[in-house]
Amino acid sequence: LGKKVLVPAFVDTHQHMASFSTFHAGLNVMDAESNEEIAQMVKEFVQSSGNKKTLIAFGASPYSVKEGRLISRKELDKVCPDKEIMVVKYDGHACIINSRLLDKLKGKVSKLRGYHEDTGEMNQEAFFECSNYITNSLSIIDLFKNMQSAIDFQASHGIGCIHTVSGVGFTGNLDITFEKIFAKSLTNGYQVRVFPQSMNVDVALKRKLPRIGGCFECALDGCFGSHDAAMNEPYVDSLGGDGVLYYDDEKVIDFCKKANRAGLQIEMHAIGDKAFDQACRALKAALDDYPRKDHRHGIIHDCLPTEEGIKICRDYNIQMPVQSAFINWKQEPDEYLESIMGKERTERLNPIRTFNENGIVVSCGSDAPCTSPDPIVWIDKAVNNMNQSQAVSVQEALRMCTYNGYYVTFDEKER
């Protein structure tokens, strides 16, 4: 092979396939350098949208545009006054909506946490409600076409298996069923493993899925970009606070115990250290209640772990689907992270080498659509981490993107 090397197909161990498929087929504004540029992109998108009444754009970030803020409702109104539009933030945890969409949803979102009428920005539960509405406006035929296009795109980047977290607001969780059917329809060897995002174990059991979890309903906190990742110590900027922990320990532990006793594999979203600790406590409690040797439960993201939590993950064999693409991320730069949490905590982010040294199984995922599925980028970020104390070898990074990914869903012997 000369200077080339043959490797197994890569695995993306955490993505939102329905969302990525939709946004991949729509307007992506991640590369815009100003809100003025985003507005122009939206204007052109509207002009080419034909008879569509509801539009979606993705990738807005206040940290990669010269204005240093998100595009506003009023700015969207100027270029899209007659159609509903939702511009989703780069982290997938917030959005900005125009007045036409706000008028449609005001009765549902005005009293929810995260509602900001003046700017049109929706966070937390207000965002979830907007997402539910948009999701149910999608054509099923278009969704299937977009999924196939998204799979083809990922295959072109060497990805042969994805773990998709599903359950983003379709009535009756129909998207979970759609993704399961779509996965079975693939005839080229491509593999899809579906994680239903629910704290109701019956959602998985009734669909004969062996796993449960992800983000949305299984997210224990928010994210750094929206200032709602749950922190043990307060943020250091003027906004302060310690983020948002969506559930108390009792609810999370109860869910984990039920899912574990049902024989399901569990994964939960935890970005901040407070959420990470909660996830560790809950999984530990579940396994103490009903020990299982080969459960392969996991905590997604693990951006700001604690020593105590890492010890639990090591001792209880809890695996970690991480996103090395978050390292030195244009949409969420270190300068911003340091401004909200200080230098010491910023330097503790994404300690992949520490995870490896503790014998924890670490795999890589894109969290698409938050980042584009590209395993070469994952390897590059993990190996060439600017924080060299947490950089890993090429061989370690390659294993994270291949064997470990298959291990996560019990596929390592087959794939």
Summary of predicted features, one role per range:
Residues F45, F153, I312, Y407-V408:
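Short alpha-helical functional segments enriched in proximate histidine and acidic residues
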Residues S185-L186, L205-L209, N260-R261, D288-R292, ...:
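Acidic (Asp/Glu)-rich catalytic clusters
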Residues H16, I212-D228, I318-N328:
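Non-cysteine beta-strand/loop elements that form the S-adenosyl-L-methionine
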